[in-house]
Amino acid sequence: MRMFPMLSPSSRVLRTLATAGAALALAGCASTPPSANAPSGAVLQTAATHAYHGRFAVQYNDRLGRPQNVYGNFDWQEHGDDVSLELLSPLGQTLAIVKSTPQAASLELPNRQPQYATDVGELMQNTLGFSLPLAGLRYWLLPTPAPATPAQTVRDPADATHIKQIRQDGWTIDYLAYADAPATGVKRVNLVRVTPPLDIKLVLDQ
């Protein structure tokens, strides 16, 4: 999932993320209609509330094609269609707050006025240098494919109740670990997009 020199918004954020602390330690297809893989119950209701906390690492290429790495902690709060994502340094300092609603999106950086746009992806790309797929993550973290577009899923042969991989909207989402009982949910997930290249690693705290 460097900020201080006065170069550009994305450069400043990158420097803060990249120098905030030690690197994050982050130690296998059948086509199906999107709704066919959704868990039963209320998880897809638009009124659902979800909260996730954990660590992120992002690899991407900047505008000059140079590879970049950013990492830190994250706090995700979701209420219906509204999402708030806070990115923090490993020491807990707020680096950026992204808010997305069906009507608009905003992004706040420390000591700067909030920025607004109708497209949260474009706002993050222009400001941070990379864009997290918030619309897809709302479902992929459950985990289930997003309902609006076709998806391919692979079930874990060792546990058919667990999804091992989702391919959707140009992304490959690999579920590396689930929480140990009695806890439930995803524990580690990697997301990869080939074009443009973007690699996201998430570890969710229980």
Segments predicted by a language model, with ranges:
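C-terminal motif of bacterial Sec signal peptides marking the signal peptidase cleavage site
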Residues: 24-28
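Gly/Pro-enriched, hydrophobic low-complexity segments
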Residues: 146-206
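Bacterial N-terminal signal peptides that target proteins for export
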Residues: 3-18
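Bacterial signal peptide processing site
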Residues: 30-33
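An acidic-aromatic
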Residues: 82-131
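Amphipathic hydrophobic-ligand
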Residues: 68-72, 95-99, 196-200
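Post-signal-peptide N-terminal segment of Sec-exported extracytoplasmic proteins
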Residues: 45-84
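Flexible, processing/modification-adjacent segments and terminal tails
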Residues: 111-169
